[in-house]
Structure formats: C-alpha cells, structure tokens
Amino acid sequence: MGHNGGVANHAGVAGAAAAAGLKSAAGLGVVGVSLSGLYAITGIGIPCPWRLLTGTLCPFCGATNMGAALLRGDLDAAWAANPFVLTALSGLTLACIFWVVELLGGTAVRLPRRLSDQRIWYIALAAAGIAFALWRNLLPAA
C-alpha cells in the first residue's frame, strides 16, 4: 500500500503497544490489589526472601502494607510504608492514562527518541531501587 497504508499500519502498531501496556498493568494491578486486600483482611503478608537472608529491607519491602493503606485511602501511611513503590505506581498510573486516551482515539503521547529505549528506564529504575534500599537501610530513622 501507499503512504496511507503505512500510517494506518503504524497507528495499529502504536495502538497494539498501548493495549499490551494496559494488559500488563492490569495483570500487575490484579495481583497487587489481591495481595494487598488479603493482607488488609487477614494480616498475612508475603515474607521477603531478601529480608529473611540479610535482615535488611529490599526496595519492595512494605509494598503490601502500602497497597493495604491505599485500599483504606490512607496516602500518608502508603508513603510511609514504601515511597519508592508508590512513586513507581504513580508513574505507571500516568502511563495507563496515556494508553487509554490513545486507545480511545486521542493523541498518542511519546517520549523523545533519546528516552524511548526501555533499557534506559530499566537501568534508572534499578538504580533508584538500589539507592532507596541503601537510604532506608543505612540512614537512621527520623
């Protein structure tokens, strides 16, 4: 096909990427809400293998408490439980909003080309997680 076929095909690929992102986020959301709800009801959480082995908190320790606090609508308690995961969740929520707008026919929001490589985001997220783990384990509680 001509130019229009390429544009339509590109739009279909972009829409497929948005749908795939939403599908992944929905799966993560179902698991997170389920585990947080179970913890809120029963008090039974997930033991952290890292904490069991080292006695230190991993970047995700407190995420179940954070989720339970969000289910109660207590943003302060959610932040106190795990600000790293809460911040990452906020970013994921923003991405989901953009994907829904795109799937409903709105403008697709894209990062600048220099920031579009997923490896950059994986490295940045890992570095932030390590920095957060060091901060929460090495600095005295205020």
Where are each of the predicted segments found?
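Alpha-helical membrane-inserting segments
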Residues: 38, 67, 71, 97, ...
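Alpha-helical transmembrane segments and their immediate interhelical/interface regions
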Residues: 1-15, 92-100, 134, 141
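N-terminal pre-ligand scaffold of iron-sulfur
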Residues: 2-52
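Short Fe-S-cluster ligation motifs
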Residues: 16-35, 82-110
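Juxtamembrane boundary at the C-terminal end of a transmembrane helix
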Residues: 42, 131-142
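Iron-sulfur (Fe-S) cluster-binding segments and ferredoxin-like electron-carrier domains
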Residues: 45-81
